[in-house]
């Protein structure tokens, strides 16, 4: 349980989990990873895995979380998924699944020990430093249009901050914007 976290701080858990997983994978595979907002783990332009989190709430407090982590470890083919890859395809090395699991669990423990309402600023900075396409002109699609813009960062609530080439700055919740790459 995360008794120190309220619904206002829910994105803190996402930051901690995605950062822990990427840290563990970097140590194992010795390759660079990035985070495609809000929860995909990439190496280059290829998706290696992702994180899903369901928070259990009591009142305004996060009483617990169900965290799902999916990592493509030793897969060799991804039919119909042009952006998918695996640790094996990136490194050429077959990995022991237990070794990957233990490294992730250890990293999660370290990040969870840091979790509090006050930990978001530091975690957010770390998360933004790994944010895929941050600071680069990219093509996006929302419910209305395709447009060019630049990812500027994330808000404390986990919204993606995009500055359109027109200068307009918009904040998007999960599911409301897609990056075309």
Regions found by a protein language model. Name each.
Residues 6-8, 12-32, 43-181:
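Long, positively charged amphipathic alpha-helical accessory segments at protein N-termini or as interdomain linkers
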Residues 1-4:
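Interfacial segments of multi-pass membrane proteins
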Residues 33-37:
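General beta-strand structural signal in soluble alpha/beta enzymes
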